[in-house]
Structure formats: structure tokens, C-alpha cells
From Swiss-Prot:
GO CC annotation terms, alphabetical: host cell cytoplasm
Top-level taxon of the source organism: Viruses
Subcellular location: Host cytoplasm
Family statement drawn from the similarity comment of this UniProt entry: Belongs to the orthopoxvirus OPG069 family.
UniProt signal peptide: none
Name under which the protein is recorded: Truncated protein OPG069
Modifications the protein undergoes after translation, according to the UniProt entry: Myristoylated.
Keywords: Host cytoplasm, Lipoprotein, Myristate
InterPro entries: E7R_orthopoxvir
Any one Pfam family match given in the protein's UniProt record, by short name: E7R
Induction statement: Expressed in the intermediate phase of the viral replicative cycle.
Length: 60
């Protein structure tokens, strides 16, 4: 389960492998955890994820 501390660290780009594992294991069994997140946290999580995917192309 994702704790609030993990979410804060997650938004800070904790670990790319861990981030990918969390996204790949997203399913109906843990949606209640995600529903407890604010929309801002969810937005930042995906912003961080896509920034990581695009960093080679954007050279940031």
C-alpha cells in the first residue's frame, strides 16, 4: 500500500523502477488507495512519470 509519505517521495522522483512498478500494478484491488490521493498528487505523479519518459528527447 502507498502511504502519504511514499506519495510525497514518489512526487520527488524516488526511484524510477519503483515508480514503474507502481504504475504497472495499478488495478482495481488498489484503486481505493489511489482514490484517497488528491487529484493534485495524481497529476504530479504522472507529470513526473512523463517527464522521465521524455527527458532524453527534451534534454532536461
Amino acid at each position: 500500500m502507498i502511504s502519504m509519505g511514499d506519495i510525497i517521495t514518489y512526487n520527488g522522483c524516488k526511484d524510477n523502477k519503483w515508480m514503474l512498478e507502481q504504475l504497472s500494478t495499478l488495478n482495481f484491488n488498489n484503486l481505493h488507495v489511489w482514490n484517497s490521493c488528491s487529484i493534485g498528487n495524481v497529476t504530479r505523479i504522472f507529470y513526473t512519470f512523463f517527464s522521465y519518459l521524455m527527458k532524453d528527447k527534451l534534454d532536461i
